[in-house]
Amino acid sequence: MRLTALTAFADNYIWMLIDDDGAAVVVDPGDAAPVLALADQGLRVDSILLTHHHDDHIGGVPALQARFPGVRVIAPVEERIPTATERVGEGERVQALGRMFHVLSVPGHTRSHIAFHTAEHLFSGDSLFSLGCGRLFEGTPSQLLASMLKLGALPAQLLLCCAHEYTVSNAVFARHVDPANAALWQRQEEALAMRRDDRSTLPVTLANEFDCNPFLRVHTAPIRASVSAHLGRDVVDDVDVMAGLRHWKDGFRA
């Protein structure tokens, strides 16, 4: 099965797993047009996986349902996704095109955000980005921490397939927070080179994120010290670190 990413809008990725017969599992199709362009060449959409209700992730679903009647649309338990045909939550499994997709509840960016992972890939939506995480629109720092801990416990060899190309901008903040991290410096240089060549910085291994992403490293001494210095006081616990780090990122200007 082949992994591919379609670009949409300014920086979205629509991830797809395509089998040898041209059938696809499509993740977060905010825009139907790039998927339909492949459908005109023979692609068949078997299933759609949705991580959360934001329109840049679900906006293309009605057009895909019109093109592929009966297509499965698998989404979180969320009334703001009326196109869903199946709703799933923490610990459930979805079988599609012979692959098993495990469902994780990862609230923070939204209250009902989920992620899907196979034995090879993590489709994280807007919960986890390379070198960053999603802004807290509906969740709490405590929920965000729990979600990051859950994602941080996944196998290191999984490939992170997140929904936005934010790596270069996230790297600037991450290096500001963790300037002595040599692995982070290397990741930034690689990402800059990729973008100069108009290449995607994704997917990336979770192992790399474990080494470089400050939101997966709130328990470490460098991140705690940096957040404490930014706040002008000692942090209380990991929730305090996460809250301070997320608020810092929200207002950060390079």
Swiss-Prot record:
One Pfam family per UniProt: HAGH_C
Zinc-finger in keyword set: no
Enzyme Commission (EC) number: 3.1.2.6
InterPro entries for this protein: Clx_II_MBL (IPR035680), Glyoxalase_II_hydrolase (IPR050110), HAGH_C (IPR032282), Hydroxyacylglutathione_Hdrlase (IPR017782), Metallo-B-lactamas (IPR001279), RibonucZ/Hydroxyglut_hydro (IPR036866)
GO molecular function ontology, one term from the record: hydroxyacylglutathione hydrolase activity
Pathway(s) served: Secondary metabolite metabolism; methylglyoxal degradation; (R)-lactate from methylglyoxal: step 2/2
Cofactor binding summary note: Binds 2 Zn(2+) ions per subunit.
CDD domains in alphabetical order: hydroxyacylglutathione_hydrolase_MBL-fold (cd07723)
Residues where Zn(2+) 2 binds: 56-57, 126, 164
Disulfide bond recorded as keyword: no
An annotated GO BP: methylglyoxal catabolic process to D-lactate via S-lactoyl-glutathione
Amino acids binding Zn(2+) 1: 52, 54, 109, 126
SMART domains per the UniProt record, alphabetical: Lactamase_B
Subunit structure as annotated in this protein's UniProt entry: Monomer.
Function: Thiolesterase that catalyzes the hydrolysis of S-D-lactoyl-glutathione to form glutathione and D-lactic acid.
PANTHER family registered for this protein in UniProt: HYDROXYACYLGLUTATHIONE HYDROLASE, HYDROXYACYLGLUTATHIONE HYDROLASE GLOB
Family that this chain belongs to: Belongs to the metallo-beta-lactamase superfamily. Glyoxalase II family.
Official protein name in the record: Hydroxyacylglutathione hydrolase
Biological source species: Stenotrophomonas maltophilia (strain R551-3)
